[in-house]
Amino acid sequence: MPSAKSSDLSPTKTNLESTTKQKVSVQDIFLYIPNLIGYLRIITAIISFLCMANHPVATLIFYGISGFLDAFDGYAARKFNQGTRFGAVLDMVTDRCATSSLIVYLGVLYPQYTVFWQILVSLDLSSHYMHMYAMLSAGSTSHKNVDETQSKLLSLYYNNRLVLFFVCLINELFYMAVYLHYYKFFWLGTVMLVASTPIWLFKQIANIIQLKNASLILARMDAHDHSKRD
């Protein structure tokens, strides 16, 4: 009786890989390490909101923790290969909600500048939403994949993780400094406000540019689609 070939008796490498790979469930995605960090960011941000009216130091601590953790969710996603669409959106939504909530409270403390705060919230939300929507609609896997042909400033802002982290951090420090200034914290308030203003201005310019670029991307796609119809 002829002997069976060894290739017939042993599973192939592909079969071994397929049997060892585990199916990732929806619950697994929610429990990925970067997403757990995202939930912790949300919790600490909410605690800071609860402290804003009467406990400025506690607000600074918890809001600071929420912002500082922003540096670690992306790192964890890369280190453990746990980058997800849900995590990317959770990260951006948390950033936008935290910043907007702080600015809203600044409107309570400084009602004479209400229109100014409204414009800042509108610019922040609209520019980031339109940028993300435009990039994903254009086929990009991430809203952070910006090349120099679109904008050198945005390319530097999104592709250099150090620049992105520090610009976002100092932008948040500006709003926190305005908050602390109301409570007469001179060194933490007024001095930090003056020091952070240039980077805050840079961030607003970046928001305007990404709003403009996103509008152009969407308009070009619309023009292409309508040209094909005609």
Swiss-Prot record:
InterPro entries: CDP-OH_P_trans, CDP-OH_PTrfase_TM_dom, CDP_ALCOHOL_P_TRANSF_CS, CDP_diag_ino_3_P_euk. Optimum temperature is 55 degrees Celsius. Its EC number is 2.7.8.11. It comes from the Eukaryota. It is a multi-pass membrane protein. Mg(2+) 2 binds at residues 70, 91, 95. Catalytic activity is higher with Mg(2+). It catalyses: a CDP-1,2-diacyl-sn-glycerol + myo-inositol = a 1,2-diacyl-sn-glycero-3-phospho-(1D-myo-inositol) + CMP + H(+). Residues 1-28, 78-89, 134-161, 206-230 are cytoplasmic. It holds the Pfam family CDP-OH_P_transf. GO terms for biological process: phosphatidylinositol biosynthetic process. It is found in: Endoplasmic reticulum membrane. The chain crosses the membrane at residues 29-51, 58-77, 90-110, 113-133, 162-182, 185-205. GO terms for cellular component: endoplasmic reticulum; endoplasmic reticulum membrane; Golgi apparatus. Its main location: endoplasmic reticulum. One of its GO terms (molecular function) is CDP-diacylglycerol-inositol 3-phosphatidyltransferase activity. PANTHER family: CDP-DIACYLGLYCEROL--INOSITOL 3-PHOSPHATIDYLTRANSFERASE, PHOSPHATIDYLINOSITOL SYNTHASE. Catalyzes the synthesis of phosphatidylinositol (PtdIns). Required for proper membrane dynamics and cell wall integrity. Belongs to the CDP-alcohol phosphatidyltransferase class-I family. This is CDP-diacylglycerol--inositol 3-phosphatidyltransferase.
